[in-house]
From Swiss-Prot:
The lineage of its organism: Eukaryota, Metazoa, Chordata, Craniata, Vertebrata. PROSITE patterns: TLC. This is Translocating chain-associated membrane protein 1. GO terms for cellular component: endoplasmic reticulum membrane. Signal peptide: none annotated.
Length: 374
């Protein structure tokens, strides 16, 4: 049995190709340094800032909750360290999904380079959207958002968060920050980088805005709603790559996308335009995290409306492009002539008829004239 040669040589250490091929292992080593730091008293004080959530407050038990105290959290500058650590975790999870799930499917399906990159993108995002949607829904149910929608604006500012709420926002920020180095690790094309930067920037802008302005209740509801619609799109695209005749998922996504934009505007106007506008405390106070002033409310609504308009504009262009491609694909099939059978009778029909009708010249052929004369 012949010895199989290696497909590629090992690149030099710390070279460009070495970092791309082994970035998950390198990041894992960096993350392990923070975890090992927890084992020693000297470094534990620094490592704990990166690994665990900071700024916790213990509220004493009340008469309604006489059994246990409540542990709540607020945000601060140390959250950047926590976001950095979980950004490393997101890079590791991204590499695991890519290597053990998506790459195996790609080898079986034999996609082209264009489909390969789009399949990887949809595979990663569909996993993230599904996980975030389930996690966010669990928080909504556990904190009674569904049974009492007024919690979106009641008792603002919402500067104190539960562990699940704060960890959710930290994870969201970490994931979208990890998308920046992934542009380098995944060898994203130069023409696709501007689109990706706008895409990532919009997520970070709105998630960080909801987190810093203490609009975490509204932000959570809108994220779950948006993630569900986006999950449906990317899972439909995955099915489309396996079977190009599959279109049902896109049709359902198109309807839910429009409804999602409408619900986003309704909830935003209801919360910011009516709920917070009628609140008694409308003074800017950084110490308590109260940003319920007219200028901030207008800025929040304007940013949401502009983003929704931008998404609808992209959606309309996407649908028009799909319709043009679909009509262009069907046009040759409509114009295509039926196959002509070879034979003497078919040639006579072609020569003597137009659109299936016999002409006068055909009826008065030389043979017919000979029969008449006889």
């Amino acid at each position: 049995m012949a010895i199989r040669k290696k497909s590629s040589k090992n690149p030099p250490v710390l070279s460009h190709e070495f970092v791309l091929q082994n970035h998950a292992d390198i990041v894992s080593c960096v993350a392990m340094v923070f975890l090992l730091g927890l084992m020693f008293e000297i470094t534990a004080k620094v490592s704990i800032i990166f690994v665990t959530l900071q700024y916790n407050v213990t509220l004493p038990a009340t008469e309604e909750q006489a059994t246990e105290s409540a542990f709540l959290y607020y945000y601060g500058i140390k959250d950047l360290a926590t976001v950095f650590f979980y950004m490393l975790v997101a890079i590791i999870i991204h590499a695991i999904i890519q290597e053990y799930v998506l790459d195996k499917i790609n080898r079986r399906m034999h996609f082209s380079k264009t489909k390969h990159s789009k399949f990887n993108e949809s595979g990663q995002l569909s996993a993230f959207y599904l996980f975030s949607c389930i996690w966010g829904t669990f928080i909504l149910i556990s904190e009674n958002y569904i049974s009492d929608p007024t919690i979106l604006w009641r008792a603002y500012p919402h500067n104190l968060m539960t562990f699940q709420m704060k960890f959710f926002y930290i994870s969201q920020l970490a994931y979208w920050f990890h998308a920046f180095p992934e542009l380098y690790f995944q060898k994203t094309k130069k023409e696709d980088i501007p689109r990706q930067l706008v895409y990532i920037g919009l997520y970070l802008f709105h998630i960080a805005g909801a987190y810093l302005l203490n609009l975490n209740h509204l932000g959570l509801v809108l994220l779950v709603l948006h993630y569900f619609v986006e999950f449906l799109f990317h899972i439909s695209r995955l099915f489309y790559f396996s079977d190009e005749k599959y279109q049902k998922g896109f049709s359902l996504w198109a309807v839910l996308f429009v409804l999602g934009r409408l619900l986003t505007l309704i909830l935003s106007v209801l919360t910011v335009g009516f709920g917070l506008a009628r609140a008694e405390n409308q003074k800017l106070d950084f110490s308590t995290g109260n940003f319920n002033v007219l200028a901030v409310r207008i800025a929040v609504l304007a940013s949401i409306c502009i983003t929704q308009a931008f998404m609808m504009w992209k959606f309309i262009n996407f649908q028009l492009r799909r319709w043009r491609e679909h009509s262009a694909f069907q046009a040759p099939a409509v114009k295509k002539k039926p196959p002509v059978t070879k034979g003497r009778s078919s040639r006579k029909g072609t020569e003597n008829g137009v659109n299936g009708t016999v002409t006068s010249n055909g009826a008065d052929s030389p043979r017919n004239r000979k029969e008449k004369s006889s």
